[in-house]
């Protein structure tokens, strides 16, 4: 697992095992906030060990940017912490998270110690503010990757933990393309120093404009291509011919997963465009 100090008392963690998924920690003198948990227990436990033994504070809050397994299944490794999330996150963990975990535990012994912990504090509109030491964390909706997405701004440092609303390759299979485009545009206007993506590396201030433009161009490109394909009888075959490079992205993103995710985006978007409203 990679670890980096982003600013004073703000830390970033990236999985070496699963899809470069990330998590964060903001620490104060008395307690810390964890922003997302990683996909596998060992890595999440390493984050807890770092907080308890290097920072010497307990974890009081865990913020889930959305309900997906690689961001929320590690809540159970922070006993006593209050979990904060979008109201829809709680519903989705009940509807999808619990059955998905039960199925995964049959296949992967490492997950047998995992238990879904539902959010204790939820919201669906506006903002929630947490004071951690000298820093304000502003939590607000960031939809599009999923219907329960939120982002966390470290106000004083202008660092945004964007969750999966911002990734090297936008992923909309469980989301909405128009909502994620809106979220990305809003992120681009925030005057940020850093974007901590839900997967991949930290985006620095001088890289933000280009990253925003690249993601919006990608989404516009697939929207145009899928709309054209949807008018043809062999739509699926046409989608299979659309390479990720044609959209301005690289297949090496996310440890080589990008091409697979791109194809899933195309098929999901076709389904969304053609299903009855």
Go through the PLM ranges and name each one:
Residues 9, 26, 36, 51, ...:
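Divalent metal-coordination and catalytic microenvironments
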Residues 85, 181-238:
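Divalent-metal (often Zn2+) His-rich catalytic cores of metallo-beta-lactamase-fold enzymes
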Residues 228-277:
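C-terminal regulatory/interaction regions
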Residues 2-49, 151-164:
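Conserved beta-strand hairpin/beta-sheet module of binuclear metal-dependent hydrolase folds
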Residues 35-37, 60-68, 84-87, 141-143, ...:
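Active-site neighborhood of phospho(di)ester-bond hydrolases with catalytic His/Asp-centered motifs
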Residues 122-154:
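Core dinuclear metal-dependent hydrolase active-site scaffold
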Residues 44-45, 49-129:
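Active-site HxH/HxHxD metal-binding segment of metal-dependent hydrolases
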Residues 20, 40-42, 67-73, 90-93, ...:
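Active-site environment of divalent metal-dependent phosphoester hydrolases
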